[in-house]
Amino acid sequence: MKKLVWLFLLFCVGCTHQPKQAAVHITLINNSQSIEFTGLDHAIIGEISRDSVPGIWQGLIPVYQMPADTDMKNYQKPLPGVYQLKDSAVIFTPDTPFVKNQTYFVRYFKFEGGNDTWDIIKGKKKLGKTPYIDLIFKQ
């Protein structure tokens, strides 16, 4: 009987749904003068593309220059530039071109999912903190 209970529990755990995370990719385009972001959530792209506020994309995917002391990267200002929506990709062109052999990073804030109370209880999400991923690239 105990084996059947363990088998049933194993079956239940094995069938739990794991939400798919968006795989964001960055690519240098236009002779390394612009960055193309692909793999963003289509619902978020649709909502933001209807908004007319010019700095809204910088709130979702800001681009930063990596400081020499990487402990200071949370205090960097985002690079100013132009964000354009092209098909399902977002293209960022900075006001000043990327410097050769300089390291940059993109901070992608993950707004999708995780709005459940159980996610807070399990420690997957903290109140007042938006989870993010830093994507590092070099020109």
Model-derived regions, located:
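Positively charged n-region of N-terminal signal peptides that target proteins for export
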Residues: M1-L4
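Acidic, low-complexity Ser/Thr/Gly/Pro-rich repeat segments typical of extracellular/periplasmic
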Residues: H17-Q139
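Sec-dependent N-terminal signal peptides
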Residues: W6-F8
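C-terminal motif of bacterial Sec signal peptides marking the signal peptidase cleavage site
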Residues: F11-G14
